[in-house]
Amino acid sequence: MTVTNRMEIESAYHKGEGFRSYYIQKIEELQLVVAEKHQNLRRLQAQRNELNAKVRMLREELQLLQEQGSYVGEVVKPMDKKKVLVKVHPEGKFVVDLDKNIDINDVTPNCRVALRNESYTLHKILPNKVDPLVSLMMVEKVPDSTYEMVGGLDKQIKEIKEVIELPVKHPELFDALGIAQPKGVLLYGPPGTGKTLLARAVAHHTECTFIRVSGSELVQKFIGEGSRMVRELFVMAREHAPSIIFMDEIDSIGSSRIESGSGGDSEVQRTMLELLNQLDGFEATKNIKVIMATNRIDILDPALLRPGRIDRKIEFPPPNEEARLDILKIHSRKMNLTRGINLRKIAELMPGASGAEVKGVCTEAGMYALRERRVHVTQEDFEMAVAKVMQKDSEKNMSIKKLWK
């Protein structure tokens, strides 16, 4: 092979390599363009799907807006697998058919349903209507009070455990004995003796839904509003069972009925009658317990206090000396006290004081120490606090300079 031929071959080879690298570069560029187009296509497909979803939603809303309104009724009872007796106000009661998407097992008495306007067919089950004021009565967070925070009420704690805590945690014991579970308990006694505190402790230990309502909240100015709130209160308690309904100041609606021409008194009596009806209506095995508290048991209606509605009445007397000492120990547990403080002597200085007043003595003693810029509480602070809270004559002899130093 001559030199000329070799040079021609090498020249052709280099030309071929140049073409190859050129086309490879072009192919890579086109692949990048194709990848970018695919990415744009996927993005456009996602946008299309999102727009289609919005279109479907708008069409459904438009269809709902174009539909005729439905009647709202309340189920009385199911008649058979395809028929239900429904009460519609004010028309009356109707036996209606079920829509194909409604299961007869989901249709229970007293539930709210929607009926078609033209055929009265039951086509939707509605949620129960609850007044916002009633829903606010349910305490979302379980109270942090415990039995250890209640001093001097060992007998009362034992009795309320038997009535409220034991049926919720161990209902089989009542079934074994063949006795009915207690429905409710009444806590009565002077103000500040620990009725509300013990109710909160029960809710903490039973881990139940705690519904707290004051009797004055059920007194409404419009006729029938208070009765409706009582009904919705028990409906909410059944939905969130096991639950405890704590009614404080029950004497505001549960006082003895008298003949009066006042419309306000009549409305309060209607509210109490609805409460009596609800106490008779719900079963004790439904894990709904009622705790009532009052400091005026003498004015309560006898119908409210009879067994079967209120099965146990627990008295909260003013604490004796030992009980006051226990309360002082509980509330001074976290206080920074000096050595040698005689809490028994402090308890002896408060004859007839309530538990709230004993707690107030601890708070006032801390305020006296704070007033003098001290980080500890002394015996003298407690004695001055007792004199102030109990309003004794010794308060007049205290040094003004000592008080306002």
UniProtKB/Swiss-Prot annotation:
Name the source's superkingdom.
Answer: Eukaryota
Q: Which GO terms describe its cellular component?
A: cytoplasm; cytosol; nucleoplasm; nucleus; proteasome regulatory particle; proteasome regulatory particle, base subcomplex
InterPro entries linked to this entry: 26S_Proteasome_ATPase, AAA+_ATPase, AAA_lid_3, ATPase_AAA_core, ATPase_AAA_CS, NA-bd_OB-fold, P-loop_NTPase, Prot_ATP_ID_OB_2nd
The GO terms describing molecular function are: ATP binding; ATP hydrolysis activity; proteasome-activating activity
As for subcellular location, the record says:
Cytoplasm; Nucleus
**Can you tell me which residues the record assigns to a coiled coil?**
none
- Pfam families in UniProt: AAA, AAA_lid_3, Prot_ATP_ID_OB_C
Ligand binding (ATP): G189, P190, P191, G192, T193, G194, K195, T196
> What SUPFAM superfamilies would the database entry show?
P-loop containing nucleoside triphosphate hydrolases
Keywords in alphabetical order: ATP-binding, Cytoplasm, Nucleotide-binding, Nucleus, Proteasome
User: What GO biological process terms are annotated to this protein in UniProt?
Assistant: proteasome-mediated ubiquitin-dependent protein catabolic process
The family assignment reads: Belongs to the AAA ATPase family.
Subunit: Component of the 19S proteasome regulatory particle complex. The 26S proteasome consists of a 20S proteasome core and two 19S regulatory subunits. Interacts with Rpn6. Interacts with imd and Usp2 isoform A.
In terms of PANTHER family, this protein maps to:
26S PROTEASOME REGULATORY SUBUNIT
Function, in words: The 26S proteasome is involved in the ATP-dependent degradation of ubiquitinated proteins. The regulatory (or ATPase) complex confers ATP dependency and substrate specificity to the 26S complex.
Q: What is this protein called?
A: 26S proteasome regulatory subunit 8
Q: Which organism is it from?
A: Drosophila melanogaster (Fruit fly)
